[in-house]
A protein has these predicted regions:
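Short beta-strands within extracellular/lumenal beta-sheet-rich domains
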Residues: 65-67, 517-532
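Acidic/polar, glycine-enriched structural segments that form the non-catalytic walls/loops
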Residues: 50, 62-218, 300-302, 363-364, ...
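Aromatic-rich carbohydrate-recognition surfaces in CAZymes
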Residues: 88, 131-137, 216-324, 344-352, ...
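Active-site core of glycosidic bond-cleaving carbohydrate-active enzymes
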Residues: 220-249, 304, 308-311, 315, ...
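Short amphipathic alpha-helical coiled-coil/interface segments
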Residues: 188, 192-195, 372-390
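An extended acidic
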Residues: 1-60, 133, 165-176, 180, ...
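Short, hydrophobic/aromatic beta-strand segments
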Residues: 91-100, 351, 536-541
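Aromatic-lined ligand-binding clefts that engage carbohydrates, nucleic acids, or primary amines
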Residues: 500, 521, 529-544
Length: 544
């Protein structure tokens, strides 16, 4: 067994204090002093894994013992725990040597918003123990982080374990989804837990975060306002509901008389924002999510608080209606990783649903009937415009173009179905489950993406793109799929390369461009290959 622990502490902020400024640290299990059984370092051979809110696995060891691990984070402390049980399955007494494990790493104070941080690993027990046949010995490894000058808190492993069990048990038992498909049921259960355990107590209040190793202590118009927030009232999670209300409060801070877009993301515990992708249709996302949340939450006081934000976002979208009657935007939630044109299906569909929600919510709040009638009229108009502007036959299916110039099927043709627009439901469902979009891993974002992904994966693995902001894989796919082939640099074969810089391969890409002008991380190079015998197959290989 090779074990490596990757730790992220969202509330220990690093410099620069941006979207990705959570303290992160990786510890290889081999860096820790080994436990010994009968004088020999333990080597584990895992044979069973289980994930049910805790990652559990069982291993056999070379001496015939069995070892059980339960790994879990603390519910409310910057702590991660590896709870270990050693079972003597032999017919003889064994000796266990638990060394004094005290791994410490202190960060440079210049790199921390709050100064230096200390990351530590300790063992709950140490010393020599005798274990009789069928007896169990238990100890824990405790991974923690804190301000370097802060007092190290006492951690009760049993208490942390019970808090985690309680969270998992309640979340699993609330809003149970049952279908004939057990895998789908498990997906939904994991999604519930993923939602409730990703909420952080920040200086800007409770914030639900997308996570993914990079996105914490911040909110997004899509991940929070559109996705998670409308779900929390159905689950009934107290922290989830508060984080949703808090996120809408943060977005409402940016309401303005000039109708400039609300930022896509409010980051760094609420003290900064990110809007580098322009208007992604964020106001449609916020209006959609706030309306649905308010109706599901069922509290008039909260609904009244959210109403100005909903009303402002709807007016913003109305002002973005183009000559064809659909909502224009700079991009969509994929932020240019895939093309979205000047107006996309997702944004207009969300706007339609937000208008429907607002007309219903406004009626409950006794809002001006003339305004609510306008919302109903605008909803009918945008629904008709969606059919006229986006409705199309794509790859033989009566479905939608994701944007006007779109020639490939896209997964988000499903969005109209989620907002009760069923005019093209049959063709859309057939397209979603077609060979163009459906893969063994689920829906591809765009037709044929899966095949392209496989072809460029080695390139991705050999290229260091950690500096690129966003989903690097989809970003590269987009670049590969949509070069401007009309440009001479791509289309001509008799190019003059006399002024091209020669580089020696093999070599790491970052070494090739030292001292050059900054780039977006992508460089093109060309090689002309003459093939005389076209009856044979050839393979072109770039070797490192």
């Amino acid at each position: 067994l090779k074990q490596r622990v990757h730790l992220i502490f969202p509330m220990l902020r690093t410099i620069p204090n941006d979207t990705h400024a959570s303290l992160a640290h990786e510890i290889d299990f081999d860096d820790l002093i080994k436990v010994k059984i009968n004088g020999d370092p333990v080597i584990e051979y895992p044979f069973q894994f289980e994930h049910k809110g805790l990652l559990s696995y069982r291993s056999s060891a070379t001496d015939g013992t069995e070892i059980m691990h339960q790994l879990f984070p603390s519910k409310d402390q910057p702590v991660f725990i590896d709870r270990v049980k050693i079972l003597n399955t032999t017919d003889k007494s064994i000796s266990i040597d638990i060394p004094k494990i005290e791994y410490e790493y202190e960060t440079d104070k210049k790199n921390g918003v709050l100064g230096a941080y200390k990351i530590k690993v300790t063992s709950s027990k140490k010393g020599f123990y005798q274990l009789s046949p069928n007896e169990i010995f238990e100890y824990s490894l405790i991974y923690s982080a804190r301000l370097s000058n802060a007092i190290e808190p006492y951690i009760s492993v049993d208490f942390e374990f019970k808090k985690r069990e309680e969270l998992v048990s309640k979340t699993y038992s609330d809003l149970v989804f049952e279908s004939p498909d057990k895998i789908l049921n498990s997906f939904f259960t994991f999604a519930k837990l993923r939602a409730v355990e990703s909420i952080f107590k920040t200086k800007g209040g409770l914030m639900h975060a997308p996570g993914g190793g990079r996105y914490y202590a911040a909110i997004w118009a899509n991940d929070q306002a559109e996705y998670a927030n409308p779900f929390f009232p159905f689950l009934g999670n107290l922290e989830g509901n508060e984080s949703a209300i808090n996120s809408f409060r943060h977005f409402a801070r940016f309401i303005n008389d000039e109708y400039k877009p609300i930022p896509s993301s409010i980051i760094a515990e609420g003290i900064d924002f990110w809007n580098a992708a322009g208007d992604r249709g964020d106001m449609a996302m916020i209006a959609y999510g706030a309306g649905r949340f308010a109706m599901a939450y069922g509290d008039k006081k909260t609904a009244k608080e959210l109403w100005p934000l909903i009303e402002w976002c709807l007016e913003f979208c109305r002002k973005k209606i183009n000559k064809d009657g659909v909502v224009a935007s700079d991009s969509d939630e994929l932020e240019g990783r895939f093309p979205a044109g000047d107006a996309n299906l997702n944004t207009s569909s969300l706007y339609y649903d937000a208008l429907i929600s607002a007309s219903l919510l406004g009626d409950e709040l006794n809002k001006d009937k003339r305004l609510l009638d306008q919302y109903k009229f605008q909803a009918t108009a945008i629904k008709n415009a969606i059919e006229k502007y986006f409705g199309a036959e794509m790859s033989g299916y009566k479905t939608y173009q994701y944007f006007k110039e779109n020639l490939l099927l896209r997964a988000w043709i499903a969005t109209p179905l989620t907002v009760d627009i069923f005019d093209r439901s049959e063709g859309t469902i057939d397209a979603l489950f077609s060979k163009e979009l459906w893969t063994e891993d689920g829906l591809a974002s765009q037709a044929n993406t899966d095949q392209l992904l496989k072809s460029i994966l080695p390139f991705v693995e050999l290229t260091d793109l950690q500096g690129h902001d966003g989903n690097d894989l989809e970003y590269i796919i987009n670049l590969f799929m949509h070069p401007d082939l009309k440009k001479d640099s791509y289309s001509k074969t008799n190019f003059d390369d006399s002024n091209w810089e020669k580089v020696k391969l093999p070599g790491r890409l970052e070494k090739l461009f030292e001292g050059k002008e900054p780039s977006d991380g992508i460089y093109w190079f060309r090689k002309k290959v003459n093939i005389s015998n076209t009856d044979n197959d050839y393979e072109l290989t770039f070797e490192d």
